[in-house]
């Protein structure tokens, strides 16, 4: 330590007596936010289909207004921290951590869920440990290590040089709140945001997050989303208006005296989809034979999901409430952003009729704040992976199996319920990431294709293993329900298609889609990429004719 202090004393003395050295030191301080802006955008762009270098060059040459805004925000924050601390190294450390971690989270989230890091995702910080399972299967690209290393090296140099702001404390105390105030005005003030147009930006909430983050860079895109945090009431919105709108949907007549309330089960099957719809792939056997067998005797077909590859919470919310998320900001998480009071849902409707209402998820119930939101939707209980009464099975990949969910549903159905029970189940077994998810010895569905790479074949093999396991449990639940004495109705549906490689890898390689840019898809391709299977079955004659005509609903 003594030797280190001597070295630092010599460095300080050299800088004080040599103006060029002092100039270089302060130039490094001045350029630090520029480095963070460049490296942060590069980290975020690592998940882009055109490559980080191309996207960064485009940002600097064509969308430089967006780059300048993001860089300005970092300068304002860094300047405020330097004023507070006086010493540059701790201010640089805090600034570096924030503006390196945030784009890194954006990259990781995009790789895992195919959704960018949005302002309301800050509410998920308490569930950060939930992502550790995904991270273990994620391959960190080499450029990310270099970018992290560059920031660490920059911080190390500043720590050695130890620049100190040569300004009296009174001016520093005044400067910090002024800079933070400017930061607030630049990000949150409506008048200032309206002037974003001077930089070639729109102050309106983005509708296409991929385009937003690709064209504007991470930090500017993140800030543009801040306008979506609060939504005003639509015109003519009132309780009276809603009562009038819903009046036409009231039932014409009540059920007969001999009507027996059925138990109702709704199961969101993670990434449940029919892989045989891929072009130029021949399967040796059907991955979902039980679904097809049940569908042939019951009602079902294809439904159009509101999301692809991730964002389970949105189709889940839509099915539970009957409300669309398409009018909400892109990338929304309804439970976190909008569910703060009791709202209508089918769970509440059944609860009002005397049913017990139970939510079951074979993962952490705190994720997406389901544990807080479900009671507001009318659920009596929300059970997570640690609350299950049935045996937990981890014999298929890193997540609890669908077998665990089906056994818990059976357990709940066997419990006494005065009138009936409504169960919402959410599976987890077939969640991505799919690369190397299972040992090849566990693959149970084979196929041939001349267009898939080795990695893409690995992805598809692992997905087929998972979806066939899900299908097996659908068949098991079907047999249980059909042999049950009490009337029971089941809805089983897939929430979205799986993510099978970067840039829609498997889908593009097989020719299922003709472009890796979603905006260029044909109407037929859009249906293909957003349509998931569903089936409705019951163990009694409902007495109602099914209305769907087989087209996606």
Give names to the regions the model predicted:
Residues 2-210:
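Transmembrane and membrane-interface helices of multi-pass
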């Amino acid at each position: 330590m003594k030797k280190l202090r001597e070295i630092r004393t010599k460095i300080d003395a050299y800088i004080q007596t040599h103006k060029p050295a002092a100039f270089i030191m302060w130039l490094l301080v001045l350029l630090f936010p520029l480095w963070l802006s460049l490296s942060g955008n590069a980290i975020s762009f690592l998940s882009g289909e055109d490559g980080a270098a191309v996207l960064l060059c485009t940002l600097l040459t064509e969308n430089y207004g967006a780059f300048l805004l993001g860089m300005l925000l970092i300068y304002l924050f860094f300047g405020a921290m330097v004023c507070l601390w006086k010493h540059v190294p701790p201010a640089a450390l805090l600034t570096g951590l924030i503006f390196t971690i945030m784009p890194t989270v954006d990259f990781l989230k995009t790789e895992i869920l195919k959704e960018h890091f949005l302002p309301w995702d800050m509410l998920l910080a308490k569930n950060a440990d939930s992502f550790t399972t995904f991270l273990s299967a994620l391959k960190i690209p080499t450029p990310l290590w270099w970018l992290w290393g560059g920031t660490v090296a920059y911080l190390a140099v500043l720590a050695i040089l130890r620049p100190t702001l040569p300004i009296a404390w009174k001016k520093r105390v005044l400067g910090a709140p002024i800079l933070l105030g400017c930061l607030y005005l630049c990000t949150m003030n409506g008048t200032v945001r309206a002037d974003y147009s001077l930089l070639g930006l729109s102050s309106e909430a983005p509708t296409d997050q991929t385009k937003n983050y690709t064209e504007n860079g991470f930090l500017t895109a993140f800030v543009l989303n801040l306008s979506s945090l609060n939504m005003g009431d639509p015109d003519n919105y009132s309780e009276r208006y809603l009562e009038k709108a819903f009046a036409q949907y009231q039932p014409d007549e009540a059920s007969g005296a001999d009507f027996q309330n059925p138990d109702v089960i709704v199961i969101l099957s993670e990434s449940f989809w029919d892989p045989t719809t891929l072009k130029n792939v021949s399967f040796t056997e059907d991955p979902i034979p039980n679904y097809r067998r049940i569908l042939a005797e019951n009602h079902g077909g294809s439904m159009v999901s509101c999301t692809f590859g991730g964002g389970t919470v949105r189709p889940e919310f839509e099915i539970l409430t009957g409300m669309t998320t398409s009018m909400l900001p892109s990338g929304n998480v309804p439970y976190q952003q909008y569910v703060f009071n009791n709202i209508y849902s089918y769970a509440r409707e059944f609860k009002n009729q005397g049913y017990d209402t139970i939510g079951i998820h074979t993962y952490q119930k705190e994720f997406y704040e389901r544990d807080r939101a479900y009671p507001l939707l009318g659920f009596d209980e929300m059970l997570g992976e640690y609350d299950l009464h049935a045996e937990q099975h981890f014999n298929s990949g890193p997540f609890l199996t669908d077998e665990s969910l089906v056994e818990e549903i059976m357990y709940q159905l066997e419990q006494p319920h005065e009138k009936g029970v409504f169960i919402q189940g959410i599976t987890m077994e077939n969640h991505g990431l799919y690369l190397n998810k299972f040992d090849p010895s566990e693959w149970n569905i084979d196929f041939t294709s001349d267009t898939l790479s080795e990695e893409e074949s690995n992805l598809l093999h692992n997905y087929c293993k998972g979806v066939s396991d899900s299908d097996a449990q659908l068949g098991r639940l079907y047999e249980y329900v059909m042999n049950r004495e009490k009337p029971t109705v089941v809805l089983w549906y897939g929430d979205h298609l799986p993510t099978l490689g970067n840039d829609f890898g498997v889908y593009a390689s097989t020719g299922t889609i003709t472009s890796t840019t979603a905006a260029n898809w044909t109407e037929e391709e859009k249906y293909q990429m957003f349509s998931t299977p569903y089936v409705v079955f019951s163990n009694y004659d409902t007495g109602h004719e099914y209305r769907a005509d087989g087209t996606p609903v």
